[in-house]
């Protein structure tokens, strides 16, 4: 079974993937100082609660946009699961899709695994919208080439900036406003309107402009924890794929399975035998 570790700026998701089925997933706050042992204590206990054992894990893939987390996640893979992890985005990794942009090496690994999953799951042109710490819009053409996109502040980031810089504004929950009116009758209603309806306007406006530039029919795929929140009041999404990133990581692993990794008393050593 594959352990897929998706380390974002806000949370790290650990998912167990068996073939094309995602058997379980757990989430922990991203913390660069957390050690491999700390990850293991937390993860192995949750696996046990779910009825899984360490011995069932025979492969690991890691996708991180937070470099300081990578080393300890690699140690976690080697020390506790006995395998060398495949690292998404590590040169000279061949993604299996063309990356048709300026400076391909600067594109985030999370955006590329989303592109890979979008290409394999849907035909034609695709726009993958991922609601994370940043909100990203990524275009994958009908041949599977990654053609670029948009990076905008995520909704939590926008709210943090608003509350942090405006001393008299209160912290509010990110939720669907209680009224369809965009005109707030109180400070809280006005903030809900700006955050929620403002984001709807951004999503619809940017997606429409991308469609106009592409000039061909496009499937719009939404992913990330807040996708379903916005789907209530916009018809711009054709598909919601909550696990797009994890599915892309599993596809990447299928294409580029790494070698075995064995531990011994003097440290860790790769035996380079195929899985």
UniProtKB/Swiss-Prot annotation:
Localization in the cell: Cytoplasm
Required co-factors: NH4(+); K(+)
Highest taxon in the source lineage: Bacteria
Pathway: Cofactor biosynthesis; coenzyme A biosynthesis; CoA from (R)-pantothenate: step 1/5
Record's cofactor remark: A monovalent cation. Ammonium or potassium.
Principal subcellular localization: cytoplasm
Gene3D superfamilies named in the record: 3.30.420.40
UniProt entry keywords in alphabetical sequence: ATP-binding, Coenzyme A biosynthesis, Cytoplasm, Kinase, Metal-binding, Nucleotide-binding, Potassium, Transferase
Pfam families named in the record: Pan_kinase
GO BP terms in the entry: coenzyme A biosynthetic process
UniProt keyword Aminoacyl-tRNA synthetase, yes or no: no
Residues annotated as catalytic: 110 (proton acceptor)
A Gene Ontology term for the protein's cellular component: cytoplasm
Binding site for ATP: 6-13, 133
Family annotation (InterPro entries): ATPase_NBD (IPR043129), Type_III_PanK (IPR004619)
EC number(s) stated in the UniProt entry for this protein: 2.7.1.33
One GO molecular-function entry: metal ion binding
Binding site for substrate: 108-111, 187
Lyase among keywords: no
Family annotation (PANTHER family): TYPE III PANTOTHENATE KINASE
Record's function text: Catalyzes the phosphorylation of pantothenate (Pan), the first step in CoA biosynthesis.
Oligomeric and partner information: Homodimer.
Entry protein name: Type III pantothenate kinase
Native organism: Zymomonas mobilis subsp. mobilis (strain ATCC 31821 / ZM4 / CP4)
Biological classification of the source: Bacteria, Pseudomonadati, Pseudomonadota, Alphaproteobacteria, Sphingomonadales
């Amino acid at each position: 079974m594959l352990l897929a570790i998706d380390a974002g700026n806000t949370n790290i998701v650990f998912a167990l993937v068996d073939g094309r089925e995602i058997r379980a997933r757990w989430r922990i706050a991203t913390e660069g100082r957390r050690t491999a042992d700390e990850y293991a204590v937390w993860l192995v206990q949750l696996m046990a609660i779910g009825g899984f054992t360490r011995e069932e894990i025979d492969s690991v893939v890691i996708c991180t946009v937070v470099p300081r987390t990578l080393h300890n996640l690699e140690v976690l893979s080697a020390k506790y699961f006995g395998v060398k992890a495949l690292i998404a985005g590590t040169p000279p990794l061949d993604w299996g899709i063309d990356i048709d942009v300026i400076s391909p090496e600067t594109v985030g690994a999370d955006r590329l695994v989303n592109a890979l999953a979008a290409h394999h799951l849907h035909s034609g042109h695709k726009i993958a919208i991922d609601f994370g710490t940043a909100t990203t819009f990524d275009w994958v053409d009908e041949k599977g080439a990654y053609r670029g996109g948009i990076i905008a502040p995520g909704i939590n980031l926008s709210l943090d900036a608003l509350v942090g810089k405006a001393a008299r504004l209160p912290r509010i929950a990110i939720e669907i406003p209680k009224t369809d009116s965009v005109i707030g009758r109180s400070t809280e209603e006005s903030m809900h309107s700006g955050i929620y309806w403002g984001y709807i306007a951004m999503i619809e406006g940017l997606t429409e402009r991308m469609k106009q530039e592409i000039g061909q029919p496009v499937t719009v795929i939404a992913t990330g924890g807040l996708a379903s929140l916005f789907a209530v009041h916009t018809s711009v999404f054709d598909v919601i794929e909550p696990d797009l990133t994890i599915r892309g990581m599993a596809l990447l692993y299928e294409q580029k399975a790494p070698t075995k990794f064995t531990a011994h008393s003097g440290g860790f050593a790769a035996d380079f035998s195929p899985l």
